[in-house]
């Protein structure tokens, strides 16, 4: 993103893929690329336009990789993409709602487009299960964390972590 207001992380008007200050690429790009490609496929089908074989392959390969990852990680979608050679991983206790929602959206668009990728249903089911598990329903009436997705709701301290864009991208 353009660093117009974050001068301490780099010169203004330059592009970076890195998280602020940690020298590590932001992991949110991967699910966005998957979802966008799957949606492009779906939109082409809906308009009766030809779908490039490269696009189908891209989406199906992502889907099959995701299915394998979800199985290997005990039913979780990836939430961290470190710098190579370290492989993508699922970091326990670091649910990343917007990434999970985008994996689900991508798999859903792929299904609607007609993908027959091995494991497609499993990817959708895994992402949906994570979203259900991480949805916060408290026993405290009016608590601000009630009805959000959060890896750290902190019900006792009132300092829970929730990001509005999680909800937007999940929906």
What are the functions of these language-model segments?
Residues 1-168:
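Extended ligand-binding clefts on enzyme/binding-domain cores
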């Amino acid at each position: 993103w353009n660093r117009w207001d974050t001068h301490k992380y780099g010169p203004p008007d330059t592009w970076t893929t890195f998280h602020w200050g940690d020298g590590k690429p932001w992991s949110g790009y991967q699910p966005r690329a998957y979802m966008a490609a799957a949606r492009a496929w779906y939109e082409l089908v809906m308009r009766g336009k030809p779908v490039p074989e490269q696009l189908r392959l891209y989406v199906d390969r992502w889907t099959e990789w995701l299915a394998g990852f979800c199985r290997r990680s005990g039913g979780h979608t990836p939430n961290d993409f470190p710098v190579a050679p370290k492989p993508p991983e699922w970091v326990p206790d670091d649910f990343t709602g917007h990434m999970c929602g985008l994996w689900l959206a991508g798999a859903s668009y792929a299904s609607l487009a007609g993908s027959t990728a091995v494991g497609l249903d499993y990817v959708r089911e895994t992402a949906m299960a994570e979203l259900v598990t991480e949805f916060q329903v408290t026993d405290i009436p009016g608590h601000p964390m009630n009805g959000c997705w959060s890896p750290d709701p902190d019900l006792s301290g009132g300092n829970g972590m929730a990001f509005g864009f999680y909800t937007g991208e999940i929906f």
